[in-house]
Amino acid sequence: MSRSSDLFHKAQTIIPGGVNSPVRAFKGVGGEPVFFKSGKGAYLTDVDDKQYIDYVGSWGPLILGHCHPKVIEAVDNVLHRGMSFGAPTELEIQLAEKIASLMPSIEKIRMVNSGTEATMTAIRLARGFTNKNKFIKFNGCYHGHSDSLLVKAGSGLLTLGIPSTPGIPQSITEHTLTADFNNLEQVAQLFEKYPNDIATVILEPIPGNMGFILPKIEFLKGLRELCDQYNALLIFDEVMTGFRVGLHGAQGLFGIKPDITTLGKIIGGGMPVGALGGKREIMSFLAPEGPVYQAGTLSGNPLAMAAGLATLKEIEKINFFEDLSNTTNKLTEALADAAENANIPFFAASLGGMFGFCFTDKNSVENYLDVASSDEVLFKKFFHAMLAQGVYFAPSMYEAGFVSSMHGDLEIQKTYDAAELVLNQLKSA
């Protein structure tokens, strides 16, 4: 038995499912998870001393790779002065100013501890600011595990939210409305049905938890127009896309300004973090300036602020995102070439340092159902075979992957060689 397997069995006796976040348990691909002990650059090393090219990147935060010297130095400098004070620090101002200077829609920003906190607070703020209760989310878009946002889509066009986990009363999600991503008509119908009741529309501008879905520009523009028409707020959940797909987030790439933006991952440089920001008059509705309450013991803690600030300074450098995008494109092209050589249907897409792929003969993937209809059995086989070759992709067909600035031509070539070997083996099996 490997040490990884031994640790997993031990973990299951003391931690529910043996993990502290469900996707890590490999339920989406079967088998047992790998336990890691270290990371450096584009690589992870497991507890059995096997090395992997890492395309998970701690689920997005590590855009500079593991243990980037500038981030380590920044954290080390702060660490010896104090890890948390529960009081304001200058670093909070510095990171807030840096984010506001880069993110087009943000005039004021509040730091929290996770993406879940950020989206939960954003919904509360939107409801408080508009004095309305209902909101629209999209099937397959994940916004953390707060009760009102953890909703499974119903079968009807205008179905009210149904909790997707025990422990959430129907009364909590009765104000959650759902629609299909990239389907503006469904959103318009929801507004027509509830013209005075919808506080906000929340979405990942590029969903990363139902694969990797690029939005139709007309869809995003239409959402902005509908929100303006019905006096609702538009929330972009850029926890994943913020500073990952471009220096100014997805909103900068697409030229759409939301009223509220939620952030996380990269702005903490690998430390736990979250944030929400937006128009001055909306953000001023948060306590202690306004009536909408939000608080957090470790919000704005110095370690996360230092790591985030160091990360943002690095990604501001000339050609950073051009180089990152080129590397990511090379990766998806390499995977597509390997699949084509094996005559296996395959679709991949990428933007900035974010990508996704699935085994399908579709020429485009536009929503959750498109991803769900792809070949999940083949994905599972591919995942495990690539893992055996030392390539670590996300252990779920529905999760996006991530490339860091430390990935280069060598890693792409190794990945291509492994994929070509694996796909030919799977084709002939």
From Swiss-Prot:
Among SUPFAM superfamilies, the record links this protein to: PLP-dependent transferases
Modified sites of kind N6-(pyridoxal phosphate)lysine: 265
User: What keyword terms does UniProt attach to this protein?
Assistant: Cytoplasm, Isomerase, Porphyrin biosynthesis, Pyridoxal phosphate
Top-rank EC class of the record's enzyme:
isomerase
Q: Which cofactor does it need?
A: pyridoxal 5'-phosphate
Gene Ontology terms, MF aspect: glutamate-1-semialdehyde 2,1-aminomutase activity; pyridoxal phosphate binding; transaminase activity
Give the protein family.
Belongs to the class-III pyridoxal-phosphate-dependent aminotransferase family. HemL subfamily.
Q: What is this protein called?
A: Glutamate-1-semialdehyde 2,1-aminomutase
**What is the source species?**
Legionella pneumophila subsp. pneumophila (strain Philadelphia 1 / ATCC 33152 / DSM 7513)
* Gene (name only): hemL
